[in-house]
């Protein structure tokens, strides 16, 4: 951003007084890196640390950020403030050094709240669908020429980044309930997509505590703000009377203020009508599959309608929507060597969903778009606690595929829990008699084991939130199946 653009932005959004150097501990995370990217473009000196390089750190380095691939006390020297992700422990040497030097240490959401404080904030919360809905709202506002700032938890494929600094007063951000830090945010508009039991360690295992935290988040809206909520979700419907703010509901339900009707899916596109109160009915073509994405689009349209955005811009943005990284992310269709004596091909889709509801939505979208395909899932459970708490739900959902390969649980720093491991889950699924799962003990064996279950008319879903995305990219690079050596080809 040039000097003239910065001056224009400063007329809208004052800079943080006396803050020049901002250091991020865990800067390679999508949420952390997105905020760092916005601040770098605002002209702040950015540094950060993480354990290994990734596309986020590479992008920040190109913007002039100093990145350390270690955690050392000297990394925070001269920092005005240190921003930490929820994954960073209090005994991290950089955190300890910052406290000793009386450098403020704040959570990611506090910095996001500071970015939002002088802007018209739109926050997207909920157990599922936050990232995609954030991208949809951002796409509509950009298509309407409103040039928003956005901070997303996933890659916005149309922009090629997780976050972008705009020149207007609008800031669109994903709001994270996993550590309850979204309570720092004070938006003008808040979307809540759904509420389910997840991250229950944060809420001391008390679902009522989780529900009340969402209510408290919505009460951070000013009295003239607006909550946009999915009335199809039973928990949200239950909570509506407790929300003391203006509400717009959306969903397939007959009483929704923004109602989805006549949904049908053709391949990767959804087609449906959106019926709005006192507004023209919209005939929507959405370039994203699944009924869950129709709901995400309805939320985005509800916000855009409230803002007075032209319907033509809304429809253009949804029809050209390019999606987000690792959300039903199409990586290619690859020809296969002859399988069962017939030539064939397989589609490869990468998806971040790691909760049973998300996995179920992905499976349903795949079945609706490609009903004749052999549906193969490569799944990596995420966290032992989630696997334990949602064990039966996972077993029920994963029986819907035609073939299942399961990697070991991605621990995300957790210790193993007896009975909440992939071997146990495979055993339970096998006992239900619908699919015979294959345990993949070593991720390097995934491609070889996958080749053994392909039929030549396949849709392969690589599913999970851990490091399984690397496996998806590897499968795309090798075109799904390991290539034979010259010696193997010629016997």
From Swiss-Prot:
Compartment(s) where it occurs, according to its Swiss-Prot or TrEMBL record: Cytoplasm
Enzyme class: ligase
Keyword Cell division: yes
GO cellular component: cytoplasm
Binding site for ATP: 126-132
One Gene Ontology term from the biological process aspect of the record: regulation of cell shape
Keywords: ATP-binding, Cell cycle, Cell division, Cell shape, Cell wall biogenesis/degradation, Cytoplasm, Ligase, Nucleotide-binding, Peptidoglycan synthesis
Main location class: cytoplasm
Top-level division of the source organism's lineage: Bacteria
Catalytic activities: UDP-N-acetyl-alpha-D-muramate + L-alanine + ATP = UDP-N-acetyl-alpha-D-muramoyl-L-alanine + ADP + phosphate + H(+)
Alphabetized InterPro entries for the sequence: Mur-like_cat_sf, Mur_ligase_C, Mur_ligase_C_dom_sf, Mur_ligase_cen, Mur_ligase_N, MurCDEF_pg_biosynth, UDP-N-AcMur_Ala_ligase_MurC
Record flagged with keyword Transcription regulation: no
Transmembrane parts of this sequence: none
Pathway the protein acts in: Cell wall biogenesis; peptidoglycan biosynthesis
GO molecular function, one term: ATP binding
UniProt-listed HAMAP family: MurC
Function: Cell wall formation.
Family: Belongs to the MurCDEF family.
Name of the protein in question: UDP-N-acetylmuramate--L-alanine ligase
Organism of provenance: Klebsiella pneumoniae subsp. pneumoniae (strain ATCC 700721 / MGH 78578)
Organism lineage: Bacteria, Pseudomonadati, Pseudomonadota, Gammaproteobacteria, Enterobacterales
């Amino acid at each position: 951003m040039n000097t003239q653009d910065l001056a224009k932005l400063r007329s809208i959004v004052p800079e943080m007084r006396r803050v020049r150097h901002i250091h991020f501990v865990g800067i390679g995370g999508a949420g952390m890196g997105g905020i760092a990217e916005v601040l770098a473009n605002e002209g702040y000196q950015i540094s950060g640390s993480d354990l290994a390089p990734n596309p986020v750190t590479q992008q920040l380095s190109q913007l002039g950020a100093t990145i350390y691939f270690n955690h050392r006390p000297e990394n925070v020297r001269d920092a005005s403030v240190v921003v930490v992700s929820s994954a960073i422990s209090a005994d991290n040497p950089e955190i300890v050094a910052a406290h000793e030097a009386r450098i403020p240490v704040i959570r990611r959401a506090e910095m996001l709240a500071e970015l939002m404080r002088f802007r018209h904030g739109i926050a997207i919360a909920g157990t599922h669908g936050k990232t995609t809905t954030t991208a949809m709202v951002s796409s509509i506002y950009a298509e309407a020429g409103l040039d928003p700032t956005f901070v997303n938890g996933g890659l916005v494929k149309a922009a090629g980044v997780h976050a972008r600094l705009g020149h207007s007063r609008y800031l669109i951000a994903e709001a994270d309930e996993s550590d309850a830090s979204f309570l720092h945010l004070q938006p003008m508009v808040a979307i809540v997509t759904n509420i389910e039991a997840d991250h229950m360690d944060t809420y001391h295992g008390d679902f009522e505590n989780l529900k009340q935290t969402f209510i408290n988040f919505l009460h951070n809206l000013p009295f003239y703000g607006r909550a946009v909520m999915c009335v199809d979700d039973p928990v949200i419907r239950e909570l509506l009377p407790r929300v003391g703010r203006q509400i717009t509901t959306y969903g397939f339900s007959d009483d929704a203020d923004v109602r989805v009707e006549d949904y049908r899916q053709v391949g990767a596109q959804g087609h449906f009508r959106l019926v709005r109160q006192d507004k023209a009915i919209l005939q929507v073509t959405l370039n994203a599959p699944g009924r869950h994405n129709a709901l995400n689009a309805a939320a985005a349209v509800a916000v855009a309608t409230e803002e007075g955005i032209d319907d033509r811009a809304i429809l253009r943005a949804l029809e050209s929507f390019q999606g987000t990284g690792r959300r039903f992310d199409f990586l290619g269709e690859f020809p296969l060597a002859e399988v069962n004596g017939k030539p064939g091909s397989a589609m490869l889709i990468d998806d971040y969903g790691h909760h049973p509801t998300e996995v179920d939505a992905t499976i349903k979208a795949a079945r609706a778009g490609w009903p004749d395909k052999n549906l193969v899932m490569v799944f990596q459970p995420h966290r032992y606690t989630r696997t334990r708490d949602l064990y039966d739900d996972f077993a029920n959902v994963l029986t819907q595929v035609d073939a299942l390969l399961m990697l070991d649980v991605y621990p995300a720093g957790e210790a193993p829990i007896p009975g909440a491991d992939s071997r146990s889950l495979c055993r339970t699924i096998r006992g239900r008699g619908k699919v015979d799962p294959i345990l993949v003990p070593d991720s390097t064996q995934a491609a070889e084991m996958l080749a053994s279950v392909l039929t030549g008319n396949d849709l392969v879903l690589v599913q999970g939130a851990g490091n399984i995305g690397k496996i998806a990219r590897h499968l795309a690079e090798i075109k799904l199946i390991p290539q034979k050596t010259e010696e193997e080809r010629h016997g």
